[in-house]
Amino acid sequence: MAEITSAKAMARTVRVSPRKSRLVLDNIRGKNVADAIAILKFTPNKAAGIIEKVLNSAIANAENNFGLEKANLVVSEAFANEGPTMKRFRPRAKGSASPINKRTSHITVVVAEK
């Protein structure tokens, strides 16, 4: 049977826009995990903190579940899909209202051995 060389972690229905999450994920894709964590620590963005948690979870999954070495891991996949949108309304002039879409993301990070 083939040996497992990757581990995955997901955060579902996170209250951050997928578009903004993708900007951060593009910075870490393909990097080794130590560099990716350093990049996320110094990224001044709400999504960066959430993505850092997901990345640390993926690293822990790799170490504990599959016995992989942290030093050999790279971020092989990192993507954000759209979650459910919470729809709200802001009151406007003359009794009208404007819609507000509070978007959510499903963030997935996969780490693999190089």
Curated annotation (Swiss-Prot):
One of its GO terms (cellular component) is cytosolic large ribosomal subunit. The keyword Cell membrane does not apply. It comes from Streptococcus sanguinis (strain SK36). This is Large ribosomal subunit protein uL22. The keyword Ribosomal protein applies. It comes from the Bacteria. GO terms for biological process: translation. Belongs to the universal ribosomal protein uL22 family. This protein binds specifically to 23S rRNA; its binding is stimulated by other ribosomal proteins, e.g. L4, L17, and L20. It is important during the early stages of 50S assembly. It makes multiple contacts with different domains of the 23S rRNA in the assembled 50S subunit and ribosome. Keywords: Ribonucleoprotein, Ribosomal protein, RNA-binding, rRNA-binding. GO terms for molecular function: rRNA binding; structural constituent of ribosome. InterPro entries: Ribosomal_uL22, Ribosomal_uL22_bac/chlpt-type, Ribosomal_uL22_bac/org-type, Ribosomal_uL22_CS, Ribosomal_uL22_sf. Part of the 50S ribosomal subunit.
